[in-house]
Amino acid sequence: MSTLHDADVIVIGAGMAGASVAYFMAPHARVLVLEREEHAGVHSTGRSAALFSETYGSAQVRALTRAARRFFDRPPEGFAGHPILSPRGSVSIGTVDHIEKVHALHAEMAPRTQGLRVVDAAWLQETVPVLRPEAAQIGLYEPGAADIDVNELHQGFLRGLRARGGQLRVNVDIRSIERGPGHWFVDAGGERFRAPLLLNAAGAWVDQVAALADIEPIGIQPRRRSAFLFEAPAGIDTLRWPFVTDVEEGFYFKPDAGLLLGCPANVDPVAPHDVQPEELDIAIGIHRIEEVTTMTIRRPTRTWAGLRSFVADGDLVGGFAPGASDFFWVAAQGGYGIQTSAAMGETCANLALGRPLPGHLQDAGITAEMLDPRRLRA
């Protein structure tokens, strides 16, 4: 006979989405997080490039990111052993053909992004001397962009979950999900878990979890993004370089532990799986970076890939499934789940528990409607 475990809330998935929402729910409910893998955060969280940028993503994403900064800058006592954010800065470069676009982006985002400014070719050459002048005639510089210690943040949420009385179970292979009178029953072979509220934070697998629960899918589309580390050019101090991308988001590179991290910014549709980097992705990334810089990248020291999961409109999803007040989506985090996690987790925790959104989230422009999965039916 299966052992039955009771909780007020079951969260499926212990990546950044599940860990953050569980952390914020734990003071108000008995929370149980179920993770299929041996370790939490394997497929997306642990493979992130880890940049905090208030100019990245849609208006919804930018609002969530701004709201998250307060937590990252001043986390609760004991949450982290060292700062979550480290100064980095970010610059999007463009050619003469991008001058109008850069100024338009600045006009759109400067009112809500402190210090955002347009920089010229001379500034770019002085700051990142490997940039080719013809490729970097103008830039949009965000001084407040920062590196995120993803592991410290993720583990902080998981430590805090446990400290607040919540539980994390790993190596849980869910076989079935059934709705009974007033409860969900999650069967994992020799164990069963029961709770009146189910949160689906299973990343690229959220539609598969929904199918087990007989809930209409949201049309999640996992996309592969590849990255690589390579040696910095000899004789040049790259430690203080900003994160560098182009206004078309065709590549990026940034300092990373004495090396440089590069990426072709690819978004290739794939089925959910333990994704691996494609050689072509890496070659494209190297080519694009070499096109705009004087760097020669001979052989990456490491390559990897991660999954970024989207719905049709590209925005994050957080809300009850239509017609199901006991099944809550925390999904479609795309490439924004790390930098929005504190705000997304707190927002979804309050919405799922029927609590009002705190004032600081409302002040940032966060609403239930902007996350509601019902928008996908329109």
Spans of model-derived segments:
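C-terminal lid/capping helical subdomain adjacent to the catalytic/cofactor pocket in oxidative enzymes
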Residues: T3-A7, G323-A378
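Core beta-strand elements of the Rossmann-like FAD/NAD(P) dinucleotide-binding domain
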Residues: L4-A7, A188-L197
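N-terminal Rossmann-like FAD-binding beta1-loop-alpha1 element of flavoenzymes
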Residues: A7-L32
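Glycine-rich FAD pyrophosphate-binding loop
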Residues: A26-T45
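Central helical "cap/lid" subdomain
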Residues: G41, R192-R240
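Dinucleotide-binding Rossmann-like beta1-alpha1 core, especially the glycine-rich loop
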Residues: A49-T127, G250-F251, R288
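Flavin (FAD/FMN) cofactor-binding and adjacent substrate-gating region
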Residues: R74, I93-R164, R169-V170, S176-G182, ...
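Active-site lid/adjacent beta-loop-alpha segment flanking the redox-cofactor pocket in flavoenzymes
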Residues: E216-G219, A232-D326, A331
